Amino acid sequence: MHIRTEFPYETTHEDIRIPLPGGTSQAEGSGGGTQLYARIWRPVTDEPVPALLEYLPYRLSDWTAPRDAQRHPWYAGHGYASVRVDVRGHGNSEGLPGDEYDAQELADGVAVIHWLARQEWCSGRVGMFGISWGGFNSLQIAALAPEPLKAIVTVCSADDRYDNDVHYMGGSVLAVDMHAWAATMLAFVCRPPDPAQVGDVWKDMWLKRLEAVDPFIHTWLDHQTRDDYWKHGSVCEDYSAIRANVLAAGGWHDPYRDTVLRLVEHLDPSKVRGLIGPWSHQYPDRGLPPGPGIGFLQETLRWWDQHLKDKDTGVMSEPLLRSWISESHRPATVYETLPGRWVGDTSWPSENVSPVAYALKGGPQTVDSPQQTGVDAGRFFPFGNDADLPPDQRDEDAKSVSFEFPVEEAPIEILGRPRVRLRIRMDVARGQAIARLCDVAPDGSSTLVTRGVLNLAARHGRDRADDWPAGATEDVTFELNGIGHTFPPGHRIRLAVSSSYWPWIWPQAGSAGFTLDAEGSFVELPVRRHTEDPAIHFEEPEQSEPLGVVYPATLDEQRPERLVIRDVAKGEWRMEVDPRYGGTRVYPDGLEFTEDAVETYTIQERDPLSARTRSDWTVRLHRPETGWDALIETRSEISADATHFITSNEVVCKDSGEVVFHRTWEKRIPRTAG
């Protein structure tokens, strides 16, 4: 990593408040005068410059401040006004928090873009960028097409809020992140404004926010099929609405990577470029596993200069899709760097990629996996931690029905989304099919390549839940997540099919497995022919100077990141997860910020109704010099019976040790599809 200290422009920065033209959050009702908290880094110049916007609910004054310091000053040093804004009701912005990506959030974002374009220091052209939430709302606001917005960079984001976000996968409830992200956001939304920025009104603002809080899990579980709630904010509903130029980036170890493939397929090829590396849910320049990282800031600068300054940087002469194809590698939960190479495709679907079907062999087989199948799935959102990625899949394969295809004289290189067709007979109304594609080495080790899920009630569409006729046989087809991978000669391609996948997938009530008939079933691989690809090069990762946050050493031993405990007598499996969100850090202005979280996922081997989840969060914000000391403690739980999901959430907030807010929510939500 190169830390850059000299730039074409000197820079300055300031914190400001951006006035909105009126209206407030959905929770707050009508009104006006709301101001959003913003930090602006600008080049020292008399010439107007384009503005770049990053718009998040994650607190610019502390939580994202270290990451912001790596990027925004860098852009300012290259001649852009780089702007970081807190979403309404979060951080130091006024107003009350609303739902995830709600209409008010997007309308506010459009208003901010117009405000930026009107400033005397702005050229009138605006770009927008972000990762995850910021990548989502960059796409969503681009679909609203505000005139000043000319280009976006969207990283690790999704075009489909139902089938490619943290809530559902293949029509099934994503137990692991439906729960974990709802619990995380419950803690996050309860964090107070900082009196160092907003003054004495902080507590009044905080209490009003807390009164408006409703756990996200209620809404998410109330919508178990793809309905209008999920269509809002899903740009796949109308790709043509996006007028801005789109650079879409993702990683093969990020759950949102298929969005890059769909964007380069459906957007005007003269206005989009895609980039998929080996990365996790991180910016590609941060140097976090798995690498190799790239000079992503430099790459985005080419994009901004091309579309906001009318400079021909050559970025539109790059292939439509640049992607990393990994070489075969042994299973491990973390890789510093993966072996492989960059390839370029000038169209997508690519003329270099052809579907090759591999027929499954054998007679009918029973697929009735124990409920703990999936404990070796790895983390849904890998961030580069030591226990994030799936370990050796042999134990998972043993709980599945597997089919193997030898790789003989030539390597088989795949790029895109594999597809399976399974001929299934089932005696119960509800169930799930999970397909995993593995690379099996001569020594028997099994590396997970990709996977896919289908809620069998969603086989006719994600917008409905159709019971399976008892004893009926049907062919079902579904895609696995996209991947770039090479299977070498001497290895075997393994398709492993299971009927459960905990804790990723919430088990269906009454699940009893199914019979898989190999006749008529196949796996279809997107095989890329061997071509002499043009050389694809990126600069080395580069960032601006770090903020100077201190992470105090501790004598306490850290909890394991992922601990699996088996109670043999009870037949119960419990996974304890420490998501490693940051621990304690001390900021240059004296703020002490502490986060601690632990997630627990429990299930019994033969009882789908035994599944339960729990998350406990503690967040403390402390300024020793002023005595300010705010503490947030939350508990979030989900369980289910045959007919309902059962949720329980609790929030306790303290000011200097005194409880100022305490609320518990208990809710039963009908199981309509999940």
Whereabouts are the PLM-identified features?
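C-terminal, loop-rich substrate-recognition/catalytic regions characterized by aromatic stacking residues
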Residues: 275, 283, 289-654, 658-674
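Glycine-rich nucleophile elbow surrounding the catalytic serine of serine-hydrolase chemistry
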Residues: 131-140
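Cap/lid segment of the alpha/beta-hydrolase catalytic domain
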Residues: 44-117, 166-167, 435-442
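Short beta-strand/loop motif that positions the catalytic acidic residue
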Residues: 242, 248-250
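Accessory cap/linker subdomain of secreted extracellular hydrolases
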Residues: 68-69, 77, 143-241
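Alpha/beta-hydrolase fold nucleophile elbow
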Residues: 121-132
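Active-site-adjacent alpha-helix of alpha/beta-hydrolase-fold enzymes
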Residues: 258-272
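N-terminal cap/lid segment of alpha/beta-hydrolase-fold proteins
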Residues: 2-46, 408
